[in-house]
Design a protein with these regions (language model features):
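Short secondary-structure boundary segments
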Residues: 3-12, 119
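Non-transmembrane alpha-helical segments in soluble domains
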Residues: 1-3, 21, 34, 38, ...
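Catalytic active-site module of serine/aspartate enzymes centered on a nucleophile-bearing elbow/loop
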Residues: 88-121
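Conserved serine/cysteine hydrolase catalytic core
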Residues: 8-85, 90-93
Length: 121
């Protein structure tokens, strides 16, 4: 719960908690989750290094959102980081911790819907 703004599970209803628990209840789920993080630190990182060296950027419009009570807000600036990787990026912090959808769905939708409306083709 330390990843939530309130440092507890109050943002999660019981159905959501049950869903999370179900997905972390078996060795296979835990293994898959660990492999996802492992790939991010190895294969994905290696591909990112090559792309960055070749000055390749994400070409589609990109929306970057982060919780203002989370680690990204403690860095130099999440949006500035994404500008290095994207041709067109916009975004801002949302009053939440790591779990934006659960902690502040109203502000998440207020950011997502206009972005998607502007870029729907």
């Amino acid at each position: 719960a330390s990843w939530t703004k309130a440092s507890d599970l109050s943002a999660f209803n019981e159905d959501a908690l049950s869903e999370y628990r179900m997905h972390y209840a078996t060795p296979e789920h835990i293994h898959a989750t660990c492999n996802d993080y492992r790939a991010g630190a190895t294969y994905d990182l290696a591909a990112d290094v090559v792309d960055h060296a070749a000055q390749r950027k994400i070409a589609c419009p990109t929306l970057a959102l982060w919780g203002t009570a989370g680690i990204p807000s403690e860095t130099e600036g999440p949006l500035e980081t994404w500008h290095e990787w994207c041709d067109s990026v916009e975004g801002h912090g949302i009053d939440s911790g790591h779990f934006i959808a659960e902690e502040n769905p109203k502000d998440l939708l207020a950011a997502l819907i206009p972005f998607l409306d502007r870029h729907a083709h």
